[in-house]
Amino acid sequence: MQAGADAVGGRILTRAANPACPVRRCQLLDATYHVLRSQLEHLLDPDEADPWPRHHQHFGASLAVTAAGYRQVGGLPAVPYLEDEALFRALRRHDLRVRHSPQVRVYTSDRQQGRVAVGLSWQLREWAGLLQHGHEPLVDHPAQLISHWQTRRRLRELWRTTQAGAPVATQAAGLAAVGPVAAALLVPPPDLWRQVRQSASFGELWEWVEAQRQAQLASHGPWPHLPLRAAVALLRQEIARLMPAAT
């Protein structure tokens, strides 16, 4: 936080467990998937407040927030569970600087009976149930992630240009400017253009976009979910393609 972060999320690890345990193997593969996602996101839409190397976790005792940042977002959201995730979304909504630091680590139990309704123990039980029936967890297709992050970067540039006071001659010109981005996001151009002009932060704009496109993706999403192992392989391929040749 001395470097300017408003919040820091640490890596959450479990104590050494039997590597032959199917649930443990699934947990490690899921962690690999999410770290690779974070690396691909960095390559496509880098965040100066959260550079690579980074991870993906901001939960429970691993999440620290400055007093000023906590006050700015209105404190801990009143939700029945996953209040840490709700707090993270509030930080993002206000464009606060969140760092996922690999240098911060906390350790927790891998028990499958926890104290909260939805948490790590719940996730471990979900994986155990899937594996018991011979199924592999399904996750987002890397092609969808690539489109998602590339479009988010374009939208952020458009929002910043608009916030900087760049003149737009007519409503038609504004709609033309957001048209390609709106098409990629599956949202109506007039609605997107209105939100671009009205949103006080990019996080507020992106939260609106996410809410609008969830229903569209559920019914019109072009990319199916993939088994976890296949998604990890594709993420590795995409990262290798995007990394500088020297590496």
Language-model region placement:
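Short, flexible, basic/aromatic active-site loop/helix in glycosyltransferases
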Residues: 27-55
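Active-site donor/metal-binding and catalytic loop motifs
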Residues: 102-118
